[in-house]
Amino acid sequence: MTSSPVSRVVYNGKRNSSHRSPPNSSEIFTPAHEENVRFIYEAWQGVERDLRSQMSGSERGLVEEYVEKVPNPSLKTFRPIDLSDLKRRNTQDAKKS
């Protein structure tokens, strides 16, 4: 049995202007956490923008798909998880205790 290669989108671009999510009174985030979230959000928005440009034919080579030549055998049974669902379950468990 052969396993299919793992593919990832690699972003090769610049960071955009700052974006702030609305505050949630039940959660307190450190400035470092907010900066990390902002960086990831901005980088992903850039990937999506560049991918749309590339797909419309106006730009080429901005977004590349990375495919591992030899997949890591320890990731063979890896199953992605929905982080929102995990957070929701953890919050519900905390409220029960």
From Swiss-Prot:
Predominant place of localization: nucleus
Residue ranges of the motif PXDLS motif: 80-84
PTM-bearing positions, type Phosphoserine: 21
Phosphotyrosine found at: 41
Keywords: Cytoplasm, Nucleus, Phosphoprotein
Modified residues (Phosphothreonine): 30
Biased composition (Basic and acidic residues): 82-97
Family listed: Belongs to the MCRIP family.
Listed name of the protein: Mapk-regulated corepressor-interacting protein 1
Taxonomic source organism: Bos taurus
